UniProtKB/Swiss-Prot annotation:
Toxic component of a type II toxin-antitoxin (TA) system. An RNase. The cognate antitoxin is VapB45. Keywords: Hydrolase, Nuclease, Toxin-antitoxin system. This is Putative ribonuclease VapC45. GO terms for molecular function: nuclease activity. Pfam families: PIN_10. The keyword Nuclease applies. Its EC number is 3.1.-.-. It is an enzyme of class 3 (hydrolase).
């Protein structure tokens, strides 16, 4: 299933956290037409391994980007949650650490219309991305 190119054209740039990996998920999303930057591309190989979540969250908000990640604890961690709230970050999380890269990418691709609708609004927010829906959790 190929995503709607008009929706992709209107979607803000996406930052892909290291929790999604640096190769497979980003490549699958790029192949589908998503415009994105990985943590490794933005920070460099060495620094990408140690950048704290609150720093990349703040950076995405400052850049006006959307964050894609797989760390469901961000909404529960006090510092990270506060960063989302204070910066107006817009995050979309696949809340399962045990699924394959193809399944992760498929969720984002299948949810493109819902993600695009949600991303039209200012943050702060976190949505979880499920096989057939997204759910606002913050």
């Amino acid at each position: 299933m190929q995503p709607d190119r008009n929706l992709l054209a209107d979607l803000d740039h996406i930052f892909v956290d290291r929790s999604l990996g640096a190769v497979q998920v980003p490549q699958l999303l790029r192949d589908a037409g998503f415009r994105l930057t990985t943590m490794r591309e933005h920070y460099g190989e060495t620094q990408a391994q140690s950048v704290s979540d609150h720093k990349w969250i703040a950076m995405t908000a400052e850049c006006g980007w959307i964050g894609f990640h797989k760390d469901a604890n961000i909404r529960r961690n006090a510092v990270e949650r506060r960063t989302v709230l204070d910066t107006g970050a817009r995050l979309f999380c696949v809340p399962r650490a045990d699924i394959l890269a193809e399944q992760v990418a498929a969720r984002y691709i299948a949810s493109l219309a819902a993600i695009a609708r949600a991303a039209r609004f200012p943050g702060p927010f976190i949505y979880t991305v499920h096989p057939s829906k997204i759910v606002r959790v913050l």
